[in-house]
């Protein structure tokens, strides 16, 4: 499977962001990508005020554009994340569309980004956003794919659930900042890939030093051995990477971590999503 990560610039203009999204998907399709990923909050600035201002319900203008884009370009589209309004609540939501434009999955960010780092970043998503209540996977002709969003990647339990439920690739739209990115971005993605012996893909917005929230960027793909297979820099880029799902089974056969778990001593309890 050929994977395309759209490390696109994000502006305060929704019209510009919509147009940029379509250009990146068009270019990814022209390059032969089967599955295309957008970054976290690609349609608006990363701020609580913007989340509230740009929020749309499922079926709104942005959702329809994503659906139509997946169908037009005949690709699987993991549509980054957008602020989704549902009644009085706003969620950080990733929609997934198949090549026919049908919505195949929807992940609402489970762990909200509430941090206060001494001498660094302070941000509280919970001032505006509500947390999701489910883990998310979907089937493709290539393999099973899990979805998480940004801060979710810090929670090993969620990723172990995705692996136990069959994920061979876990896609993470994310926007680490200039405090957390240099310290933890690559480390976390390599760790989650190694922990679960599957592919991890992190898709971030391009870096804009003039923005109120500066993305670390550096979109990347890690393989089941925990190696960085491909990585972007800070500038806008379409990162393309071939994913060989057979590597997942090969690595798990060599070092059978999932099979070797001592469930007589410890267990990860969770409710299976239907």
List each model region and its residues.
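Cys-nucleophile CN-hydrolase/nitrilase-fold catalytic domain and related Cys-dependent amidase chemistry
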Residues: 14-15, 23-106, 115, 176-196
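Short polar catalytic/cofactor-binding loops
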Residues: 7-13
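Short beta-strand scaffold segments in enzyme catalytic cores
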Residues: 79-80, 93-96, 136-138, 219-221, ...
